[in-house]
């Protein structure tokens, strides 16, 4: 099951050239860029691991691509995404986020049903990948 989080998630994976164009756009807007990775694909997992430091005041697309390639080499079997942060007063938010690397196999999610007070049903879901300990999921 393909994970759909962030911008472009319903499109085919971006090529390196397309990624460069998105980074160039973010740089032209003076947005700070960071690279994150995780092996926990749950949609509510907001705490991905940060690769290095955020790339504040970077005006060179190749510098970002170098960091991206370094992250890909070390975490090739995990999810990797790029975030762009706009620090403009009144915005101060992540304005662009897209996945640029995925595991070769994405196992999908399990629906979990439990009974609550008054026989009410509660539903939650978890990734099949999280059945294994962190660091050995993919």
Curated annotation (Swiss-Prot):
RuBisCO catalyzes two reactions: the carboxylation of D-ribulose 1,5-bisphosphate, the primary event in carbon dioxide fixation, as well as the oxidative fragmentation of the pentose substrate in the photorespiration process. Both reactions occur simultaneously and in competition at the same active site. Although the small subunit is not catalytic it is essential for maximal activity. It holds the Pfam family RuBisCO_small. It comes from Antithamnion sp. In this alga, in contrast to plants, the small subunit is encoded in the chloroplast. The basic functional RuBisCO is composed of a large chain homodimer in a 'head-to-tail' conformation. In form I RuBisCO this homodimer is arranged in a barrel-like tetramer with the small subunits forming a tetrameric 'cap' on each end of the 'barrel'. Belongs to the RuBisCO small chain family. GO terms for biological process: reductive pentose-phosphate cycle. Heterohexadecamer of 8 large and 8 small subunits. The keyword Plastid applies. It is found in: Plastid, Chloroplast. SUPFAM superfamilies: RuBisCO, small subunit (SSF55239). One of its GO terms (cellular component) is chloroplast. This is Ribulose bisphosphate carboxylase small subunit. Disulfide bonds: none annotated. CDD domains: RuBisCO_small. Keywords: Calvin cycle, Carbon dioxide fixation, Chloroplast, Photorespiration, Photosynthesis, Plastid. The keyword Plastid applies. It comes from the Eukaryota. Its main location: plastid. GO terms for molecular function: ribulose-bisphosphate carboxylase activity.
């Amino acid at each position: 099951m393909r994970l759909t989080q962030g911008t472009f998630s319903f499109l085919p994976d971006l090529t390196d050239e397309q990624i460069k164009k998105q980074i160039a756009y973010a740089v032209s807007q003076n947005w700070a860029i960071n690279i994150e990775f995780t092996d926990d694909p749950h949609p509510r997992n907001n705490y991905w691991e940060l690769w290095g430091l955020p790339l504040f005041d970077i005006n060179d697309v190749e510098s970002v691509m170098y960091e991206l390639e370094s992250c890909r080499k070390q975490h090739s079997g995990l999810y990797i995404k790029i975030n762009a942060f706009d620090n403009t007063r009144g915005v101060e938010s992540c304005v662009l986020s897209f996945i640029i690397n995925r595991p070769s196999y994405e196992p999908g999610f399990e629906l979990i049903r439990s009974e609550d007070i008054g026989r009410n049903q509660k539903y939650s879901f978890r990734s099949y990948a999280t059945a294994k300990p962190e660091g050995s999921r993919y």
